Curated annotation (Swiss-Prot):
UniProt-listed HAMAP family: Asn_tRNA_synth (MF_00534)
Lineage: Eukaryota, Amoebozoa, Evosea, Eumycetozoa, Dictyostelia
GO terms, molecular function: asparagine-tRNA ligase activity; ATP binding; nucleic acid binding
Protein's cellular compartments: Mitochondrion matrix
GO biological process: asparaginyl-tRNA aminoacylation
Entry EC number(s): 6.1.1.22
Designated name of the protein: Probable asparagine--tRNA ligase, mitochondrial
Length: 460
């Protein structure tokens, strides 16, 4: 039994601990609390399956034929009994034999929306406040939780400092204009609360650069917001981003770190969330495990943007140099390379944000200048990571700001980072929810965040 259970001995033992330590607990009296996930009544005996959210596997409770006659699906109960080896055909299975009547904690009426059957994800989105009691969202929450721990562990082990960047900002990192503006009840036509327009952040990158230029390796992991009027399986208005920022690196370093980070997360999730990912492989996407294992065993492809355009043109995709790559084209590229993640690098400057470092033009056949950047495309999801080397040259950055018609005074602080001891630096942003889609096989991004926020949906 782990130290937490020992220290807080009044807590009921959790089901995942029972499954993990059942050899030590066989024959012992235990107390378990949870929700009823299944009820089966037979002639001389009855069974319930109890779940407490700690494991995809429930715990079978055995009583006599009348033990659970009044119990309803979804109710919360306390059980006291002896842990025994199952009397059924599965000799590895365990169960709890009641030694006293269960204690009802919270009854669940017949109108309970979740029933012991398969519900559509669309239905579950309408009951987001209780959908986590089902297997799919319950498993997702455990994978999400472990992923969060692994993210912090990876950066801590590699000497990064975690920076809490602001949620409220005056900057638009991506330049798309899809920001939520903040207005206070104290705002008037003459004065604003912050003295200037302020918004919910679309990225912590610009602020993270401040600390990369003093502490070399930093990362931020927090919520970001986009006022996108899109109610699609790929869009959320509130989502989470992991954004490392590093001094003294080039594009190849950035690519190496991004690939290593992704593989670290996947490798450790396959080990620590094995049962949950096997559940997703069985119930959601039967190719999930093989795809993840292939991702681990194969180097990611590195493909120049110009070569990606040529590949698409050769396969009758309507695209030309200077165009962005669309979702279906992303899917084609990863499929073409055998369902392996693909970095597309060195994109046209004109379709990327202002802060990306302009490449030296050695190939004068290009119509437009390019920037030192990368987009990581992964099977089934599309773009997972966007990153770049940042423009560290003061004059180059100032020229780009002027060319794009931006207010240079608003970005004077950002230019100062280049004025005082500038260094080459870069980083990337990984969309947390898209990563969770990749490792679970869930197709709708609204199903991988606990409480989704999107256009026309903010119930609670």
């Amino acid at each position: 039994m782990n130290n937490i259970i020992k220290r807080f001995y009044k807590w009921p033992i959790r089901i995942n601990e029972i499954n993990k330590n059942n050899k030590d607990l066989i024959g012992k009296e235990i107390k378990v609390k949870g929700w009823v996930r299944n009820i089966r009544n037979q002639k001389s005996v009855s069974f319930i399956e109890l779940g407490d959210g700690s494991s995809i596997k429930g715990l079978q409770i055995v009583g006599d034929k009348d033990s659970f006659s009044k119990l309803k699906y979804g109710s919360s109960i306390e059980v006291n009994g002896k842990l025994i080896n199952s009397l059924g055909n599965d000799k590895e299975a365990i169960e709890v034999q009641l030694t006293e009547p269960y204690k009802l904690i919270g009854n669940c009426p017949d109108c309970y929306p979740l029933q012991p059957k398969n519900h559509s994800f669309e239905f579950l989105r309408d009951i987001a406040h209780i959908r986590s009691r089902g297997n799919s969202i319950g498993a997702l929450l455990r994978v999400r939780n472990k992923s969060t721990q692994l993210i912090h562990q990876y950066f801590n082990d590699n000497g990064f400092i975690n920076v809490h960047t602001p949620i409220i900002t005056a900057s638009d990192c991506e330049g798309g204009g899809e920001q939520f503006q903040i207005k206070s009840s104290l705002d008037t036509k003459e004065s604003m609360f912050f003295g200037q327009p302020s918004f919910l952040t679309v990225s912590g990158q610009l602020e993270a650069e401040i600390y990369a230029c003093s502490h070399s390796r930093v990362y931020t992991f927090g919520p970001t917001f986009r006022a996108e009027k899109s109610n699609t399986p790929r869009h959320l208005s509130e989502f989470w981003m992991i954004e490392p920022e590093m001094a003294f690196i080039d594009l190849n370093d950035n690519l190496d770190i991004a690939e290593d980070f992704c593989k670290y997360l996947i490798r450790n999730l396959l080990d620590s969330c094995k049962e949950d990912i096997e559940f997703f492989n069985k119930r959601i996407d039967t190719n999930l495990l093989s795809r993840l294992e292939k991702t681990l065993s194969t180097p990611f492809i590195r493909l120049e943007y110009k070569d990606a355009i040529q590949l698409l043109q050769n396969n009758n995709h309507p695209i030309k140099w200077g165009d962005d790559i669309q979702r279906e084209q992303e899917k084609f590229i990863t499929t073409h390379f055998g369902e392996i993640p693909v970095f597309v690098i060195n994109w046209p400057k004109s379709i990327k944000p202002f802060y990306m470092r302009e490449n030296e033009q050695t190939d004068h056949s290009n119509i437009m200048p390019t920037v030192s950047n990368m987009d990581l495309l992964v099977p089934t999801v599309g773009e997972l990571i966007g990153g770049s080397i940042r423009e560290e040259r003061y004059d180059k950055l100032l020229n780009t700001i002027n060319e794009m018609g931006m207010d240079k005074d608003q970005y004077s602080w950002y230019l100062d980072l280049r004025k005082y001891g500038t260094v080459p630096h870069g980083g990337f942003g990984l969309g947390f929810e898209r990563f969770l889609q990749f490792v679970t096989g869930l197709q709708n991004i609204k199903d991988v965040i606990p409480i989704p926020r999107h256009q026309n949906y903010c119930k609670f």
